[in-house]
């Protein structure tokens, strides 16, 4: 799934959030309520009432960390694929650009198919799989129903005890708060900036668009809902900023190390002088041994 497909998805979610209502017992039924809203209600009640003794702010923070740990393997795989793809594309780019020019100049369907087949061979040679980029959307898709379930739990005040113990830090968890909303928006903007650093040049325009759309969407929804959702997003964004920063450092070094054999292979194939140089060094080393 390309990131462009996330825009209509976000619009559909906003329409869905605006249309659903679980505020009365007779409305609390159906697949979505029973699968996502009800479990989130029981989990938040257990954390807030039993584990943290009526501290629902801590309950939401722990809930965020729990969800982030579940998503961590998918996120790490995404970071690794992104860095590997970027480093390998640097090596393969001259060949890829040449084939893409062939595709543009192709006049028949057969010529286009032949050029595309040639492109697939280049991807195979450098062990590149563009389909892996689809996994980048997986954490978002997994998290969406969880966030939507939490949204309805908080919006319709379904958690027992939250109305009696709504305060955390300076804000009321059951009401909108402008400051926690702004914090959530700013942190998601920073997260988008940090993430965009690893994007290939051709994808950065979409990344810049998401930098604007994500914070605006989060601010808009947070202002319509209780500040508990703003707290959820703030903690989640802070976790993502830290996670992305350290993952970029680690996987950037790892990708450069693993791509080095492909660079050496490319130089041998496209720079004959490097082959001669390599042979000469081998001859010199043999003479020195003698």
Swiss-Prot record:
Name assigned to this protein: Membrane protein insertase YidC 2
Membrane topology, record value: Multi-pass membrane protein
Organism: Staphylococcus epidermidis (strain ATCC 35984 / DSM 28319 / BCRC 17069 / CCUG 31568 / BM 3577 / RP62A)
Gene Ontology BP terms: protein insertion into membrane; protein transport
Covalent lipid adducts (N-palmitoyl cysteine), residues: 20
Keywords: Cell membrane, Chaperone, Lipoprotein, Membrane, Palmitate, Protein transport, Signal, Transmembrane, Transmembrane helix, Transport
InterPro entries assigned: YidC/ALB3/OXA1/COX18, YidC/Oxa/ALB_C, YidC/YidC1/YidC2_Firmicutes, YidC_ALB_C
Entry's transmembrane regions: 56-76, 134-154, 176-196, 211-231, 232-252
Region of interest: Disordered: 266-290
């Amino acid at each position: 799934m390309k990131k462009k497909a996330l825009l209509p998805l976000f619009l559909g979610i906003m329409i869905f959030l605006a249309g659903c209502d679980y505020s009365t017992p007779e409305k609390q039924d159906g697949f979505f309520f029973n699968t996502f809203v009800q479990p989130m209600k029981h989990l938040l009640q257990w954390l807030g009432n039993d584990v943290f003794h009526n501290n629902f702010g801590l309950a939401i923070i722990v809930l965020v960390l729990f969800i982030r740990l579940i998503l961590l393997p998918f996120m790490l795989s995404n970071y690794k694929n992104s860095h590997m793809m970027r480093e390998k594309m640097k090596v393969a780019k001259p060949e890829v650009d040449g084939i893409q020019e062939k595709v543009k100049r192709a006049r028949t369907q057969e010529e286009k198919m032949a050029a595309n087949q040639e492109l697939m061979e280049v991807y195979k040679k450098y062990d590149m799989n563009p389909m892996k980029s689809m996994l980048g959307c997986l954490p978002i898709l997994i998290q969406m129903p969880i966030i939507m379930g939490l949204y309805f739990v908080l919006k319709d005040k379904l958690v027992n005890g939250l109305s009696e113990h709504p305060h955390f830090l300076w804000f009321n968890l059951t009401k909108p708060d402008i400051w926690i909303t702004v914090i959530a928006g700013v942190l998601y903007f920073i997260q988008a900036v940090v993430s965009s650093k690893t994007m290939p040049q051709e994808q950065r325009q979409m990344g810049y668009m998401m930098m604007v759309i994500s914070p605006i969407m989060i601010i808009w929804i947070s202002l319509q809902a209780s500040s508990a959702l703003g707290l959820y997003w703030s903690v989640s964004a802070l976790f993502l900023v830290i996670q992305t920063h350290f993952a970029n450092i680690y996987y950037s070094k790892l990708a450069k190390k693993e791509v080095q054999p492909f660079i050496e292979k490319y130089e041998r194939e496209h720079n004959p002088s490097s082959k001669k140089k390599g042979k000469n060094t081998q001859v010199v080393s043999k003479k020195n041994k003698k």
